[in-house]
Every structure is written in C-alpha cells, then in structure tokens.
Amino acid sequence: MRQKTSSNKKKQKNTNNISLRRKLGLMYKKAILGLKIVLMIFVCLFVFTKYFTSIKTYLITNIYQITTKLGFRLENVIIEGQQNVDELTILKVLNANKRSSIFALKLDEISNNLKKSKWIKEVYVSRRLPNTVYIKLFEREPIAIWQINNQLFLVDEEGYKISKDIQPFSHLLHVVGEGANIYASQLVLELKKYPALLNKTLVAIRVGDRRWDLNLKGNISIKLPEKEFEAALKYIDALNKNNRLFNQNYKALDLRDRNKYYIQKY
C-alpha cells in the first residue's frame, strides 16, 4: 500500500510540473507577442509620424557622420548619356557637397528633379559604394524644328516640345502646321532614305493635318499624297538623280494622285 501511495504522489507531482511548464510557456509566448506588438507600434510611430522627430534627426545625423568617417562619402559623380543637358544643371540638382555621406542622397528626389528637364526622357540614379553616384540619362533626340503660331520648337520623334533654342539644330528639317510635330518622325525617316533630296528640302508643311507639301530649293513645291507617300519621294529622288528636277523650270509637282502626276512650270 505504501508503494502505491508513493507512486501516485510521484505521478501527481509530474502532472503538476507539466501543467506549470505549459502555463509558463503560454505566458512566455503571450509576453513575447505583446513585446512584438509594442515594438511594432513604437517603430511605426518612430518612422511614420512626427513623434520623436528630434531623436530621429539626431540618430540619422550621427549615422551619416559615422558612415562618412568609414569612407562612405560622396567623392565621384559618373554621368552617362549626357549630350544636351548642361552638366552644371545636373550637379545643381544633385545638391550635395563632396565628402558628405553618400547615404544622405535622396535618389528618388534626384531622379524626379532631373526629369523636370525637357531634354531628359528617363533617368537612372544609383549609389556605387563606397563613394560614387552613377547617373544614366536617356535624352530626347530632336528630329525637326516645328513652327506653330509663329513660334519655333525643337521636337523629338514623339512630337514632344523639347526647347525653343533651335540655333544649334538649324540643320534639322523645318516642319510647319497643326500636327506637323506628331507626324514629322515618319516623314524624316522616309526622307533619310534619300539624303540628296532631304538636303534640298527647306520646309515641310502639314496640310489639313492629313498630308505634306514640301518646299525645295529653287522654289519648287511638291504636293505629296495623303497615304503611301514613299513612292512619290522615290519618284522625286529619281528625277533629282537624273538631273531632271532643278533645271527644268519646275514650279510645282502635284503627286497626290498616284496614277497621274501633274507638273506646273514657271
């Protein structure tokens, strides 16, 4: 009987110990969960609100100072793809002193400010640790000078107005009229197949936002068809190559009807 009683007491004691461990384990898990929640709330308040502003500023400033001493400071700026954007403009947007912490640079802000330049279509900015900022520019390429409402603009292949400073690009084709900026890329692309003809073309006028008139050297006017004007350009180029365009006293060539061309002389 004494052995049975002793055995029962041991079982009861073991059961009590297991129950206590379970309770302690559950309390521990709850405490950890509560600590995580409190920590998460604190982090959210610290990062996403104005609370602890002075502390944040102090910590960030010290982090920048430490990283600078460790060699993570701005010393080099690499710029690729720059052709027409002024380098000083880029450095001004960068707005950073040499030897300042490279982590202090706000890359998204730099990128957005650079995109404000009408020359820049896209830009990529990154850090190259420990001391370099890399800027890759994708500039808009001017293809023509567009005249509209007595104003002149450089335009790219999408018809986007880049700049009013046309002087450095005076060699580009001059296009005139409503919609001329949008359709200039197609015309320029076709004319580039015939360099001699492109060189003789002074102005391309968009008529009714449907088709083109070309004004050539020698006061010759060419009326192109609304659609499939490539054949008409090929015909004009052939005349030029055979020396039958600029010495025939032509005033106008009406090529709008692909089945019958009309020629007017002075």
From Swiss-Prot:
Cellular localisation: Cell inner membrane
Summary of the function given for this chain in its UniProt record: Essential cell division protein.
Membrane topology label: Single-pass type II membrane protein
Single biological process term from Gene Ontology: cell septum assembly
Spans traversing the lipid bilayer: 32-52
Cytoplasmic side: 1-31
UniProt protein name: Cell division protein FtsQ
This protein's record includes keyword Cytoplasm: no
Origin: domain of life: Bacteria
Limits of the POTRA domain: 72-140
Protein family (similarity comment): Belongs to the FtsQ/DivIB family. FtsQ subfamily.
UniProt keyword list: Cell cycle, Cell division, Cell inner membrane, Cell membrane, Membrane, Transmembrane, Transmembrane helix
Residue intervals annotated with topology Periplasmic: 53-266
Keyword Translocase found: no
InterPro entries per the UniProt record, alphabetical: Cell_div_FtsQ/DivIB_C, FtsQ, POTRA, POTRA_FtsQ_type
Pfam families: FtsQ_DivIB_C (PF03799), POTRA_1 (PF08478)
Main location: membrane
Annotated Gene Ontology cellular component terms: cell division site; plasma membrane
PROSITE patterns, per database record: POTRA
